[in-house]
A protein has these predicted regions:
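Short acidic/glycine- and proline-prone juxtamembrane loop motifs at membrane-interface regions
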Residues: 124-132
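Transmembrane-helix motifs of polytopic, lipid-linked glycan transferases
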Residues: 79-101, 115, 120, 139-143
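Membrane-interface alpha helices of multi-pass inner-membrane proteins
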Residues: 47, 155-171, 182, 205-208
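Membrane-interface transmembrane helices that cradle and orient dolichyl/undecaprenyl
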Residues: 140-158, 331
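Short helix- or helix-capping micro-motifs
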Residues: 109-118, 163, 167
Length: 494
């Protein structure tokens, strides 16, 4: 690595910008259909609310705003996600530059995020709220480290923005600023930064950002937390010791799943020279160690006293995203030479930057050879186009939010309701005809689903209409494989 490049790391951000633009292009080329989180964003962008359910509303608010400016489209979805990811990597790189002297290690730390499967693959595949958590964590972490090293009014404000956004992204984000606070208080050299009057600005900014949602949360706490708690505590009828064992083992597996590949890659590219780093440290490595320790203790307490039995790897994003930076800080503290390792590392990154988009596209396109179909293979748009030739729907009732979001993408001017989300119930009086659409399971009944029939009776006083079937070829179909949808038309009473 030349001395010029060591002084100038802007090439990292140019490389990342090109990579995320490539990801936008790949997503648009893969399929017009939407996956679960994408469809949720499109469906819920029909209205603006202080809260929507088990997930806090940050991403919904952001996507709603963008759709208001650009219209509903897959391009708007993909650009928002990849722009958030790019900004997150940018802030991560700026944070690394604050506390690492070796610019090669700054590059390795920043691009090292691409070695974490949950960050590089899962976030692109479908996740939205986890992307918002990473974005918020990157803002907070930059503001936090800058407040410790180069304190200013702006740095404390940035930290407050990160906390506010993070709590609006996922509730478990609260563990990150708590861990950071405890970790900094444990170091006498950093303690004055915590007892700084400017910390009041951090708290006030965070509170202002989350205040609208807090008022909603006060009246909807059960609605907002029930689903998450159900996922976390799904241990069946296991005894307390068995539940704790399940929780601890799931946490261990989640940590290995999250960090294993990154640790393996660093071990390979640095080889034996990595060994001295294991026993080396600095003020910054000690800070990050305490943060990660507090975070993990917090989760263990949730397992032991909160009944959590299933910890998912993506829930570790608010804390373990600092892993590449932590390893690089250890390497620098040991005085390890980085020139050869950097060249090897860039080969790995090149493989990842080419391989991940190819894998994302291939997981859908390979269906023409394997006959294994993903949600993105489903032909929602051709189905709706055919049904609109029969009649132009004035409103649509979908069997679930996945279907509702996919339908709304192609008919944004028409209200689309979902049986599984009663929170959105616009006035349908005078809107006719009403189109009902549902997914047909393979070899399942073709009749109108009971919950849709009940919805019609309760909301419209309408009897069960004739159920019909339409099938369309899968995207990237093998042979004559087709996907079936059930549908029905209802002429509503005036």
């Amino acid at each position: 690595m030349t001395e010029t490049n060591r002084r100038d790391i802007s090439w990292i951000f140019a490389l990342l910008a090109a990579y995320f633009m490539l990801q936008v292009g790949v997503r648009l080329a893969t399929s017009h259909s939407l996956d679960l989180d994408e469809a949720e964003q499109v469906f819920r962008s029909q209205w603006l609310a202080a809260g929507y359910g088990p997930q806090p509303p940050f991403y919904n608010w952001l996507q709603y705003t963008v759709f208001q400016l650009t219209g509903v489209s897959l391009a708007a979805l993909s650009v928002v996600k990849n722009l958030l990811l790019f900004i997150s990597y940018l802030l991560y790189g700026l944070t690394a530059r604050l506390i690492l002297r070796d610019k090669a290690l700054v590059a390795i730390a920043t691009l090292g995020l691409l070695t974490i499967p949950q960050m590089v693959f899962e976030m692109q595949r479908d996740l939205t709220h986890t992307v918002a958590v990473f974005f918020s964590a990157s803002i907070f972490f930059y503001g936090f480290i800058r407040s410790l090293k180069q304190p200013s009014l702006a740095s404390y404000l940035i930290a407050g923005v990160g906390i506010g956004f993070g709590l609006l992204a996922k509730y478990n984000f609260a563990i990150l600023p708590a861990a950071a606070l405890i970790a900094a208080l444990a170091d006498a050299r950093l303690r004055p930064r915590i007892f700084d009057r400017r910390l009041v600005l951090t708290a006030v900014v965070a509170l202002i950002i989350i205040l609208p949602h807090l008022f909603w949360l006060k009246d909807n706490l059960d609605f907002a937390t029930a689903r998450t708690l159900e996922k976390m505590t799904a241990s069946g009828h296991a005894s307390y010791p068995a539940q704790v064992a399940m929780g601890v083992s799931s946490l261990a597996l989640a940590v290995i799943s999250f960090a294993g590949l990154t640790v393996a890659i660093f071990a390979i590219i640095f080889g034996k020279s990595l060994r001295p780093a294991l026993g080396s440290g600095s003020q910054w490595t000690q800070l990050l160690e305490r943060m990660m320790l507090v975070f993990l203790i917090g989760i263990l307490l949730l397992i032991v006293f909160g009944g959590a039995a299933g910890i998912k790897d993506r829930w570790l994003v608010p804390m373990l995203f600092i892993l590449p930076l932590y390893v690089c800080l250890k390497i620098e503290a040991a005085g390890v030479t980085t020139a050869k390792a950097f060249r090897r590392f860039m080969i790995v990154i090149a493989i990842i930057m080419i391989g991940v988009p190819a894998a994302l596209y291939g997981s859908v396109a390979a269906a023409r050879f394997t006959g294994h179909y993903e949600r993105l293979n489903r032909p929602y748009a051709p189905m709706l186009e055919t049904l609109r030739q029969q009649a132009e729907p004035a409103a649509i009732l979908a069997g679930d939010s996945l279907l509702a979001g996919n339908l709304r993408q192609d008919i944004p001017g028409v209200p689309v309701l979902s049986v599984d989300y009663p929170g959105f119930s616009p006035d349908l009086s005078g809107r006719r005809p009403l189109l009902l659409v549902w997914l047909l399971p393979k070899d399942g009944s073709e009749a109108l689903p009971p919950d849709m029939a009940q919805w019609l009776q309760t909301n419209l006083g309408a009897s069960t209409p004739e159920a019909l079937v339409i099938d369309k070829p899968y995207f990237y179909q093998r042979g004559d494989d087709r996907y079936r949808f059930g549908y029905a038309w209802v002429n509503q009473p005036g």
